[in-house]
């Protein structure tokens, strides 16, 4: 009989969102007439920008002709999309990123997991707490952790608390780590990092020869012009950071699938024999072996994000969701709940009422208001006593959800 990867058996029972789905399905079975409003999983609801749809329709027409047909594309992405990303996402913000340092993919969730393919087994790893569960679970799956403790934390990982007491700012550790996961604007707390805070992280990484894995999937939601959108806005970050970005939330590509990862060519790691090796070449080799690229049609749609029409339409989408976030913040604050985030990110991070833990508040809102959110404890032990609501829904449903919650 074939042997399995035993590391999967160390995973806690049920990934957060499948557990939410299980509870919601049980409720819906028992209450088939209930009109549920889902503000849990961060999936967008508004249609794709028209510029992207038009570009994909043209690409489909191209593909129907002999001259315009495209088969396998470059595993790294088509040059015209990489050039547009470099110009508009990085060079426009004075970041020294070249098109060759950009790898187009089908999702930053995939990339933030798959990056472990090129990193060693013995790195000391730090994550923030609360944390996007994929960072932790992907390390568990490849055997980089020990067992789960009663607290929900895994042996072999170090956790940096982010809570109201420290202003949801991950404090720079005093001990050595090789690999650090950062996500700003943060999922799930909605907190942000200033340039000064990122400068301290880059300084730490350079002093410790550490690598920062920087998830900037929500950078487009930043409203404060003083806040950085990329870690590469910080001097020295090219030498110590990989950045993940996505078209999922800013342009609504959750079902269309397109993202990209940036690996500067100067970024180095060490081999088991202590030789310096550039990470760009390793990732390029990995992608060439395990990835066939994003479809031509989808990449044309992503390219259109950077057209004048696309930029205007994406800006309208961002404004729509951030207006939803403001409604959530103001309505919940009006009934005395403490609400964090929701100002530079599409997530509101709510302190649960006294006497309720995260899952109790989840069940309370599900039963009493028929509103689905995300329990903070599902993001780590420091998320206990908090609850996440997403701004990704229609205006009518957000208003109705707030009416229900403020009425119970």
From Swiss-Prot:
It comes from Prochlorococcus marinus (strain MIT 9211). Substrate binds at residues 15, 42, 109, 132, 187, 292, 388. Its cofactor is pyridoxal 5'-phosphate. The lineage of its organism: Bacteria, Bacillati, Cyanobacteriota, Cyanophyceae, Synechococcales. The modification N6-(pyridoxal phosphate)lysine is found at residue 249. This is LL-diaminopimelate aminotransferase. Pyridoxal 5'-phosphate binds at residues 72, 108-109, 132, 187, 218, 246-248, 257, 292. GO terms for molecular function: L,L-diaminopimelate aminotransferase activity; pyridoxal phosphate binding. Homodimer. It comes from the Bacteria. Transmembrane segments: none annotated. CDD domains: AAT_like.
